[in-house]
């Protein structure tokens, strides 16, 4: 993410950078993690107090698209190694959709450098080798950036960290597949498998699905990411295919049209909702009617869900929602105005 002074003539001349130059010497790059080293950035933030929140998670990781280079700059593989954009991407002989080089959509992207994991990947991942839990991207580059009414992978390569998730509100990679589990559940497995300390987390993070918590009481960006992941095939295969529509319905009258759109798209991926009629820019009354209609469809599907008696999903013994607990989460929804600038 670059910055320019409006007084400069960059609109006519552009940036001074030319291929082969030192980019940092010619183009100011906003890096919140280096605030102390960038006095010019401190001045900019003072004049634009919402700037960082519009683009970054609280710890400085990007939360929107179009700024993937920022993620690379914060990645140890780049800082301590030779990783660059072209380590994975190619301008030629690639799919224009993602411009990934040959086989870079697979674990080869990481194993080309981290070759020691190739022989016994499951020993590292603790998941079956062919499962989504053994896909390097899913753990180390989860979909935590909002983009084009969807979610895309973070380009800051890191590892699941419950303490960071609790502190920043950024979804944890483990919970994005295991959408039916709590943050505490993740902390216990990371401790068992990788000896990561178990941090103290809020009561809700001990008892309720982490994704569900973001969906119901997160800010608009968190709600959109949570909704997208409830419709993500990799998540549904792990977390079930039945409980999600009841909670996606809660977003059909969300204050943000973008959130409503993402929720609707996820909802249509579930059985019984493929032809669900809905206009995400309809009147408030129509949005509320659609929400009620979705709830009725879900309830008519029956209560013999595999997820019945799942307190972390707010479901009682009969597979119905604990309405009081649901409302308590909705009452805590973060309605702080937010704009995620891609």
Model region roles, listed by residue range:
Residues 204-212, 238-252, 273-281:
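Amphipathic alpha-helical scaffolding segments comprising HEAT/armadillo-like alpha-solenoid repeats
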Residues 221-222, 243, 258:
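Structural detector for tandem alpha-solenoid helical repeats, activating at a conserved register
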Residues 1-235, 279-290, 294-298:
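Primarily the internal scaffold of c-type cytochrome electron-transfer domains
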Residues 268-272, 283-285:
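TPR/TPR-like (Sel1-like) alpha-helical repeat modules
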Residues 224, 228, 246-250, 261-265:
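Solvent-exposed, polar/charged alpha-helical surfaces in well-ordered, non-transmembrane soluble domains
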């Amino acid at each position: 993410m670059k910055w320019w002074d409006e007084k400069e003539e960059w609109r006519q001349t552009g940036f001074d950078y030319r291929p082969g130059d030192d980019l940092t010497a010619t183009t100011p790059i906003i890096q919140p993690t280096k605030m102390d080293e960038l006095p010019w950035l401190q001045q900019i933030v003072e004049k634009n107090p919402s700037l960082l929140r519009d683009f970054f998670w609280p710890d400085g990781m990007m939360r929107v698209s179009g700024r993937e280079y920022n993620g690379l700059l914060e990645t140890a593989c780049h800082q301590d190694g030779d990783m660059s954009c072209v380590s994975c991407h190619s301008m030629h002989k690639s799919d224009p959709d993602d411009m990934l080089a040959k086989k870079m959509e697979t674990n080869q992207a990481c194993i080309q450098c981290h070759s020691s994991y190739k022989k016994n990947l499951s020993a590292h991942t603790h998941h079956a080798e062919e499962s989504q839990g053994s896909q390097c991207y899913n753990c180390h580059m989860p979909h935590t950036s909002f983009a084009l009414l969807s979610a895309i992978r973070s380009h800051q390569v890191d590892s699941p960290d419950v303490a960071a998730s609790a502190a920043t509100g950024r979804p944890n990679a483990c919970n994005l597949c295991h959408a039916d589990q709590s943050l505490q559940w993740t902390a216990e497995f990371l401790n068992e498998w990788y000896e990561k300390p178990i941090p103290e987390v809020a009561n809700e993070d001990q008892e309720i699905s982490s994704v569900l918590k973001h969906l119901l009481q997160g800010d608009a960006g968190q709600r959109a990411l949570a909704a997208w992941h409830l419709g993500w095939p990799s998540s549904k295969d792990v977390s079930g295919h039945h409980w999600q529509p009841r909670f996606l319905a809660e977003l059909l009258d969300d204050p943000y049209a973008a959130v409503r759109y993402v929720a609707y798209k996820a909802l249509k991926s579930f059985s019984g909702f493929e032809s669900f009629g809905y206009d995400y820019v309809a009147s408030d009354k129509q949005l509320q009617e659609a929400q009620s209609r979705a709830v009725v469809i879900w309830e008519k599907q029956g209560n013999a869900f595999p997820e019945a008696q799942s307190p972390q999903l707010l479901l009682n013994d009969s597979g119905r929602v604990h309405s009081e607990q649901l409302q308590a989460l909705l009452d805590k929804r973060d309605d702080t105005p937010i704009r995620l600038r891609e």
